[in-house]
């Protein structure tokens, strides 16, 4: 090992030295962090329960639902289940506090608002909004709920801000299912694009941003792009590989003097991309990944798009990204393959962004800036991963409308606390990561809640026994058969 590599190894390891100040008073920080959210609730019981539930979401529990959290923090199971599942408190004031805190810490003029759906697989048919639909979590059509999320991506970090439950159209028309799951009367069916626009209209002025981004589920709808342009928003939206475009920078066919002058033909973005010369791609380094720099190749071209019913649409920039499916050394081994086989060694993504700004002037965003916006989509996926792996985002056991929204709001708040503590800890330990902050905090909470006395152990066991016996009782009652009491055993 050369001296330079040895020095860098030493530097990296020194960045991992954890000062006691990183975790000192972290439990107190959580208590102080919760105060603004407690003030958003009206009852003392709600203020107490929000702190306990957040502590449970940040704990060591394998399944972070109301029952498991209640056992950890030593409160009655029904108390937390009612608080999350059916209590009539409004989650929106808590979201308002969250948005304010995220903007205060991360806000920047050219920040990025990112929209993305996330699915939650379910087995039954009684949870609000559940239906056989596309489940991105499993990569197929399956029984699931889908939430639409609004995130904020800055250069320093990212966070989820707001959300909407995607209520399918057949659910919106079913009065019996709506009543069973407590769906409010004023809630009607809205497309996911409409839900994104609703959140943008609600928070757009408060959240400083220069771009809006989303995947091809949103970008394929021309009306959604049109609505963003009408609001003066700059966007980078994914589109399917079948999207029809006309290359406005390609040579136009020669005019023969009769009829209308010919125009470049319509073709799919995939067919258009396959005609490109290999030299037109520009290589950029997006970020430094765990296994080295992550590079992509990009191209930008001014095109005309189509509206519904094959009507001619506006001019937009088509942006194509190319990333290898394997590392560079593996690609060199495929140099002898023909063009089609070499093309299969890459993953392509297609995006559209407006050519004109709010004042109608032609915009020329740089490839580096477009790459930054495209990368924001990956940041939102990372936010989902944080929520699901560190704060039990997908581990709820509720069926009602309010239960789903209560759990989601508290999950986003819990993750934001981890982000805040990670930023604080990185001042002393630069290599500190959010999962390690959650791990350290969970150990501290274990010490707080698990100093068990004989009396508390008896309460834990009693709750489990009562749960089991009540289940046995209701099963027997359904069959109109009186359950037998269990006999006390005499010690011989």
What spans do the regions from the language model cover?
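Gly/serine-rich nucleotide phosphate-binding loop at the start of the catalytic core
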Residues: 2-84
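Glycine-rich phosphate-binding "P-loop"
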Residues: 25, 176-195
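An anionic, glycine-rich sequence signature occurring as long contiguous blocks
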Residues: 31, 156-181, 185, 236-240, ...
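Short, conserved catalytic/metal-binding motifs centered on acidic residues
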Residues: 69, 109-123, 150, 211-220, ...
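Active-site-proximal, Lys/Arg-enriched surface segment
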Residues: 83-169, 174
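Short, surface-exposed basic-aromatic patches at helix termini and helix-loop junctions that form
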Residues: 205, 223-234
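Short, solvent-exposed helix-loop connector elements
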Residues: 268, 364-374, 389-405, 425
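Basic, amphipathic alpha-helical segments enriched in Lys/Arg and hydrophobic/aromatic residues
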Residues: 393-451
